[in-house]
Amino acid sequence: LAEGGLVNRRDPFPGEPRWYQMTGKGLAHIGNPLPTPGVNLSEYKHDVGVAWLWLAARGGTFGPLAEIVGARRLRSLDGSRERGAEPAGVRLGGFGPHGRERLHHPDLVLRTADGRRVALELELTPKSRTRLEKILAGYAADPRFAGVVYLVESRAVARSVQAAARRLGVSDLVHLQRVRSTVSRSASKPALTAERAPGSRTRMPEAVR
């Protein structure tokens, strides 16, 4: 694939497994209309984790699904939608650059056969209180979403999400799942595995069971 120009081989960090990135030619070959993905090495761990989440969803971890949509596709849909059309992302209120309404795009959106949606957010680093509350308020105001699952690695991030959900009165909408990431420079097989926090009362939404 690399020799044919369909993917680029990359070795971003010494001692870390090589990874591959689709090229424009590769995307065209499989009929994918999305633009060539960019590279942000500061988000490497997050992006690899989301890829593992996508594979888990495709493999049935979250139950039968009609569709799995990633953030890149959501942003692409919103970038080309007509004025007045419903956005693919979650409305945050207000407008940003060029007069576009402010939107948040989940890492993954799982759609069940009956049309319900559940957002997956891989939250490896904390957001500011203001930013997090705006996102949760956006989910609460969007009737398309049956729930949002925050997959967190640290207890501090878990507490931050729980506290924000309580302040906004949306605890029933927000679900937490602890995960352990082996996406590191020493891991030969990067992965993302779920673990249940002791005493946790959170659960997956019924929409994806």
Predicted segments — roles?
Residues 1-38:
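Nuclease-adjacent, charged terminal/linker segments that flank catalytic cores
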Residues 126-209:
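Non-catalytic C-terminal interaction segments of nucleic acid-processing enzymes
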Residues 34-51:
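A short, highly charged nucleic-acid-interacting micro-segment common to nuclease
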Residues 5, 61, 143-146:
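Structural motif
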Residues 10, 45, 58-118, 124-131:
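Active-site metal-binding core of divalent-cation-utilizing nuclease and nuclease-like domains
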